[in-house]
Amino acid sequence: MDRRDMTISAWRQQLQSGEVSSRELVDQHLKRLESSEPSLNAFVEVTADQARAEASRIDEARAAGEALGPLAGLPLAIKDNLCTKGVRTTCSSRMLEQFVPPYESTVTERLWQAGGVLVGKTNLDEFAMGGSTETSAFGATQNPWNTAHVPGGSSGGSAAAVAAGSCVASLGSDTGGSIRQPASFCGVVGLKPTYGRVSRWGLVAFASSLDQVGPFAGSVADVAELLQVIAGPDPRDSTCLDAAVPVFSDGLSQSIKGLKVGLIKECFDAEGLDPEVKASVQASAAQLEALGAELVEVSCPRFNDGIATYYVIAPSEASANLARYDGVKYGFRAEDAESLAAMTARSRAEAFGAEVQRRILIGTYALSAGYVDAYYKKAQQVRTLIRRDFDAAFKSVDVLLTPTAPSTAFKAGAHADDPLAMYLADLLTIPVNLAGLPAISVPCGFSAAGLPIGMQLIGNVLDEPRLLQVAHQYEQAAQVFASRPEAALVP
């Protein structure tokens, strides 16, 4: 069996049986990481020595008969906007290039308590603002399927690392599609949970009412396992829901016969939707129908208003969140400034990249006294209407289905001079964040050029179990997940 296609449960069985040790497993993934990294640039920081030491400690604990967590010995990667105690957290920005957090984020703390082993921090668009992982201060990440193409963003490093086999699974964050779009582009599974299902404590904030942490993995079952570990209430995050955490893997094997799957009309009629993507997702919908699901066309009339709404709300929240970076307490500080005001202005001008500066300016404008009613408040009203459209749709269906992205991974640099084209790549994912719903991207095919295509399934609030059930049943029937970008990997 090709070990790059193995699931968390299969690795766990081999670790428990002694067929492979945690140290051997970590070494295998580090070897693959080191071989693929020159062509991918998926990592900002590789923690090889720390990973090997932790893996050896877990092997000793296993040999001593100690109880171990469900992820014991498994090599994991973390998006570099999640704080990791003692390990740099840069947000791929010059502003935080030397920042080493004195504390651990809730989600990473839960991963380490479950036995996970950190192999590195992954590259992202600066402060998670982008859709291609090209705005990183540490260089762009490439797509493992074709290194002339982008991996998506902003969690492109996390998606590329899983696709390349540099780790068993990874974490990302999703503000407008930043888990699902890279998952689609890189041919892996990516889940954005319900807003508040997973703690944001220790996630460096971009847009606080939209940000959500979620997992990438090679299969739906693996994503369910990771969600089981990171989900749940957190008193340190007031937006984290005090909701019971179900066993997400319990219903994976159940038939979807009789479930109603809604195909959102506005998504399949969207301007700019690649015909190959549309055909692949429609064929996947037909496969769900063959499994016993009932397909229903539904309408979300304000779905296409999501882009305009998002690009008022998200930059507005970003301009407030990023105001803390002033060159005083931490982060980059410009030298030889003639005054405090000049130091702050120069620190931001020198340390923030062009896209981050653009979004701060948009947000500051939208929140200014003369325009807050016309832009920000109106955007919040439209956001409510978008959520009501979803509420209406879920009265007649169990899950919703769309393409994840309008196209396959585009070529590196293709949208460098056209921010609007870059923003439109999130057309099909953004409304889900505005509504706070859970959604998953599952590989559903390939283009003629050999690039992955993703299908997005959207669930109702806190209905991740149903979402994962449908995704798993499709995945098992389609077997698309078994493919890997072999050309980008070492044997």
UniProtKB/Swiss-Prot annotation:
Keywords (alphabetical) are: ATP-binding, Ligase, Nucleotide-binding, Protein biosynthesis
Assembly with partners or alone: Heterotrimer of A, B and C subunits.
Please tell me one Gene Ontology term that the record gives under cellular component. Answer: glutamyl-tRNA(Gln) amidotransferase complex
Q: Name one GO molecular function term.
A: glutaminyl-tRNA synthase (glutamine-hydrolyzing) activity
Q: Where is the active site?
A: 79, 154, 178
Per the UniProt entry, the disulfide pairs are none
Could you say which protein family the record assigns here? Belongs to the amidase family. GatA subfamily.
Keyword set includes Transport: no
Q: Which InterPro entries match?
A: Amidase, Amidase_CS, Amidase_dom, AS_sf, GatA
Name its species: Synechococcus sp. (strain CC9605)
Know the name of this protein? Glutamyl-tRNA(Gln) amidotransferase subunit A
> In its UniProt record, which GO terms are filed under biological process?
translation
Q: What reactions does this protein catalyze?
A: L-glutamyl-tRNA(Gln) + L-glutamine + ATP + H2O = L-glutaminyl-tRNA(Gln) + L-glutamate + ADP + phosphate + H(+)
Task: List the EC numbers from the record.
Answer: 6.3.5.7
Give yes or no: UniProt keyword Metal-binding: no
Class of enzymatic activity (EC top level): ligase
Q: Write down the HAMAP family for this protein, in alphabetical order.
A: GatA
